[in-house]
């Protein structure tokens, strides 16, 4: 870039880009990786500067498919063998109808679901990481997942999603106490790291989006 920052390379995280509506979900997640790998190849030409765009790719895969997800993971790797690094599973949901779920529409308790665990077990043999996007009430479930699979690298997204809307409105102290307790416990899992960002979303309840 010309901003003065020396951005050597970037990592792409799944966002449902370029899904073909005529394809099944198994094919759609591969559509995205194919698209992003093409952008990375364009970047590698050097025509757009020195920064290596999408040098790492984190895609999506339906781990609730259990053992059947293995073929999907292998297709991701075959499409981008040098760049594909892991998957993200969007588990962020809450039964409170005033709190939006992610576009993935996850089921409740997905991180402790047996079929999910069956699918999750296919990450370690392929040296793939796991990006966890959940709300703070789901942190205990993520702790269970991290302990069950200690050899799989887990990256916590968005500070663990502290909520400040819906039934959590005006409950900052209660929310922080719960969040702090479980973030501290999660930090004891040596296979877990945290990615900083995503604390200014509407769901966090700071209402910064209303400022003029």
Describe the predicted segments one by one.
Residues 106-212:
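Catalytic pocket-lining loop regions of alpha/beta-barrel enzymes
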Residues 1-126, 146-148, 168-170, 177, ...:
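Mid-domain alpha/beta scaffold segments of enzyme catalytic cores
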